[in-house]
């Protein structure tokens, strides 16, 4: 079974919940070499399929070999709908550095929620290993909302886990289809 693991560690300050912060650590393991895995992760059709499989209301994808930008509109979780409205717009920006001889490369993922003081800053490490290629995501997700930051953080955790899991599942299907 493919590995998709996510670790979240919360760091909430005690004063009115002004800032909620989650440490993100997620891993994907794909059955392809790093060159093929990177090509998949930057293919606009793959990125669009991840959006569809994630249940996005709508999405817009722009991707080339070293940069992808995805705008995703999603239904807001019921527990925070009163604070945020019916939908959220997520802006995902991934930038890749050049590959090493073995296809290994690093990159960054910046995720923001349009109109909210929430963001994820994540380092990406793509390298040979596992079933072919391991992709590690390590960073922080921060929400700066007085009084409700902790509640919003609690709603974000399952969505982050789901996102990395969907990427693993869609990636496995994509690679198996050849």
Language model segments and positions:
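Short, Lys/Arg-enriched N-terminal segments with co-localized hydrophobic residues
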Residues: 1-21
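Hydrophobic ligand-binding cavity/cleft-lining segments
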Residues: 15-73, 84
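Short, surface-exposed coil-to-beta transition loops
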Residues: 23-25, 87-93, 118-123
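Solvent-exposed residues in well-ordered beta-strands and their adjoining turns
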Residues: 29-33, 74-76, 95-97, 112, ...
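Short amphipathic beta-strand and strand-loop transition segments with alternating hydrophobic
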Residues: 55-64, 95-96, 121-128
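Glycine-rich portal/gate segments that line the openings of hydrophobic small-molecule binding cavities
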Residues: 60-109
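A conserved amphipathic terminal alpha-helix motif
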Residues: 95-98, 149-178
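Beta-strand/loop substructures that line and gate deep hydrophobic ligand-binding cavities in soluble
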Residues: 104-158
């Amino acid at each position: 079974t493919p590995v998709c693991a996510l670790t979240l560690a919360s760091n909430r300050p005690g004063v009115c919940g002004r800032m909620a912060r989650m440490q993100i650590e997620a891993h994907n393991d794909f059955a392809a070499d790093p060159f093929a895995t990177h090509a998949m992760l930057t293919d606009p059709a793959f990125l669009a399929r991840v959006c569809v499989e994630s249940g996005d209301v709508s999405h817009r994808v722009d991707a080339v070999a070293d940069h992808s930008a995805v705008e995703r509109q999603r239904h807001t979780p019921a527990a925070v709908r009163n604070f945020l409205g019916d939908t959220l717009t997520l802006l995902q920006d991934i930038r890749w550095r050049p590959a090493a001889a073995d296809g290994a490369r690093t990159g960054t993922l910046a995720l923001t929620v349009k109109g909210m003081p929430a963001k994820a800053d994540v380092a990406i490490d793509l390298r040979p290993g596992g079933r072919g290629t391991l992709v590690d995501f390590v960073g922080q997700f921060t929400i700066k909302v007085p009084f409700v930051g902790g509640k919003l953080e609690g709603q974000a955790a399952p969505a982050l886990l789901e996102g990395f899991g969907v990427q693993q599942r869609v990636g496995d299907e994509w690679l198996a289809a050849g």
